């Protein structure tokens, strides 16, 4: 080979080693399956129907519409395929670019990752059966790669060799799916090819089945090709070191040589028959293991050199929720192993994405097998399969998280190793010679015989196994001794645990008892708070009643004054006006009878001299009686005054009774405030409570901390002293604050009592004066009535005596005329008298109207029945309620931090209802009530002027 070609190849390899590529990540979302449709689970994943956008959105909240879009999480990947994307599109977009690199000599890997029942196996294998020698539309990536591989190889003239293997990782155990012998001695082991020694070839087993008809030279040409071969055995160590650039080597795995796509499909179907599958509640054909289908390509690239490239097609088992899948016993163990390996794979992805120093590849066999594919020297594509249903939202989010992080992993792809044709032929020839010698030895003897060299290899293997057995025995003995020590430690730990559990149970019972006490205390405080609220309402009601009574009293006094002063004054003025009218009318008309009497006297001068004195006296007396005799108005006035007196007396009695009741209520309230409000047994209750808490703390301290009795006792004494002093100071301060806040209220109540007493005294004085005035009026009216009756009797007597004399004079015409004139004038006087009587009757009606207005005012100004009933009901409820001191419940000890969970109590226990009360009650002065409004609900608020 020329030197410049060697230099060019070396520089190309260095450039390839320095190039870094990210892992290609694709997301495939299937449609909802029958189980999800039956469960009526909504779609929470937003993807294109086929492909297009590179973003996947998932809504993990219960919101819809714009809010759901705003709160949804979006993941960006390289490719996104929706439910309508078919198998051919997946292969064309994801697997075909890697296949082209595989043909160029790069190592490539395709991984399918996701939860169970999302279509991983369908994506990787699909329908692997052939129909008339052709693939179906549902065929997956592996069958399509098989056909495309041989189509591409047949289109070239170069020599090639294709081998394939199929391994399974089940419960962290490797298994060869193409091995039908099930030989337990051929356990698959994982080695790093860089750490293997060339001298260990004898310990390596064959990678192909021992079948005599499978030997051939291993080459395949396009035109001259030997008969088909099923399998060929190659040397273990030297071949792997020279063939592959990978650092991971699986010992004892069988590799089958295939010459066309049909044989590759048969190998795939053979392995699928041995794969572990089972039925769960989430999937009828659930894969219970991870599988890796590997295709090895030896392709002639330059004369006698062959380029070795490898493609790993990985079908990972799906993660599953054991409670939802219904896995039990063996299935639960399988699910645990699957989840554990996938969890390790997730940690590896996170470490690689975060560029951590330590990558936990060796924590799981799965991650060790994928060490080259993740962060190694291969080109890798990851297909994440997800479900769109809401019931799988958590698993979908986890899958998308891993896929998004895997996108940041960088690999350094390198071309596969070069192998000389002579080395490849020499390895195949040595394998054929070894198989031939074993076959001849077996054929010439009755039993199974082998050559000396082969026997020596087996002896060496036996010695190595014996050495390993001895080392294992020593390890077993050391582990047994360690196990015994651990058992002793475990027994001691169990005893300590039982002791601690008993203590914890006692503490839990104590805590429950204390919680019950706290509940009782909370109940008592709630009742006390309710009582305080009711007393506040009663206080506000009483204040409103006092205010209404004051307003009613002022209005009543003003209305009575207005009625009495204005009514009587107007009546007096109208009376004077009427009397003046009568006087004027009497003076205007010539009503004097002196002229008539003089005429009669002159006429009867001779005959009436004997009775002149009596007639004159009678006339004078009559005129005097007419002027002085009271009319019917005086009688009605007397009756009206009597009725007014009785009404005033009844009103005075009613008002006195009401004021007496108010005064008694105020006296009772003052007595309660002075004797009972602040003289309760708060201090005694606190002392008893503190003493019981102190005894409880002391007893618990003696039981739990017996070795620290003296220190705990001193601490408890000091704590008790501090707590007692602080509680006493707090109680005294509360009582002083309550007294200082209530003192203005008490002063105003005392002042209101004084005002009520003054009002009562003024009312009694007014009643006495009005009664005395009315009595004087009645006496005067009685005296005038009596004198009028005497005068009337005298006039009647004289009239009777004069009647006889008048009869004697009735025959005289002139006398008749004069008498007629006198009668006319007398009639006129009677008319005037009747007018006066009518006027006085109308005046009496005015007095009646005045009396009705006074009664109406009294009725309107009387307190409403509803207010009286509400106040009486409230006072009856307060008097009927018996207040008892709060019972002591003991002191709550400090809660210990326990290892096991204790049921948390409701947070309302720690919130005392007494603390929520507003004790800053403000009593509004009557002087300032004009500037303050009382709301319908809530405390008084000042007006903004």
From Swiss-Prot:
Residues 193-208 have a biased composition (Low complexity). It comes from the Eukaryota. Pfam families: Kinesin. GO terms for molecular function: ATP binding; microtubule binding; minus-end-directed microtubule motor activity; plus-end-directed microtubule motor activity. Residues 450-562, 634-675 form a coiled coil. Keywords: ATP-binding, Cell cycle, Cell division, Coiled coil, Cytoplasm, Cytoskeleton, Microtubule, Mitosis, Motor protein, Nucleotide-binding. Residues 190-243 are annotated as: Disordered. Residues 22-409 form the Kinesin motor domain. One of its GO terms (biological process) is spindle elongation. SUPFAM superfamilies: P-loop containing nucleoside triphosphate hydrolases (SSF52540). Residues 234-243 have a biased composition (Polar residues). CDD domains: KISc_BimC_Eg5. ATP binds at residues 114-121. This is Kinesin-like protein CIN8. It comes from Eremothecium gossypii (strain ATCC 10895 / CBS 109.51 / FGSC 9923 / NRRL Y-1056). The gene is CIN8.
